[in-house]
């Protein structure tokens, strides 16, 4: 038996880059998207950003957090009711980075281990990201058994960088590439213009939904990718998101 699963990921860029102006764009896109499970990066917990995003539409979500570098900031996984997350775990990846994983049983009986992360950002430090990817793989190899693993996030790595090569060698496939034939050319920067915006690095594909095990992508596309009406310099975040429709158990 197979289960359908709709997943998404977005680096929400904390509270920087015209946050008060772009927050309504995040909420509007989330209201339309309503995935089953979503990974968020750069969440500021005291601002309740993850819970606010989860409450933007008709669906209700549980937010599961994993701090990175300091206790008020990090990654979050939103799990849509009535799905339940079990076996929650966090790993520290050093350089103020971490990952979170949860085990989810789907209505048809299939199980998914869903993980979210945000790797080191300095463009030249490919070896750091490669080491972080290796630790992620070891951690996921030791995770509770599941039919499939879904690993999402901002990897700060192009598809040909060692971290991504290592993930593919470990059996992970990019959902976007599986559905479309190749990864998107760019997921950062989005096109936002803001004081103090991050300009370190060339535009490229840095964000992914990785799949391993009995799962395949039937559709994948960019999300949170539309500028504000009347302002082409304002986007939901400095990153574009990705969403994917999956079949788990085959």
Residue ranges and their predicted role:
Residues 125-141:
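Alpha-helical scaffold elements lining the catalytic groove of polysaccharide deacetylases
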Residues 19, 37-119, 219-224:
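Structured beta-strand-rich core segments of catalytic domains in phosphoester-bond hydrolases
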Residues 7-23, 70, 120-128:
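Acidic/histidine-rich helix-loop elements
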Residues 20-24, 50, 96, 161, ...:
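Structural motif corresponding to alpha-helix initiation and N-cap regions
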Residues 141-149, 157-250:
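Metal-dependent phosphoester-hydrolase catalytic domains
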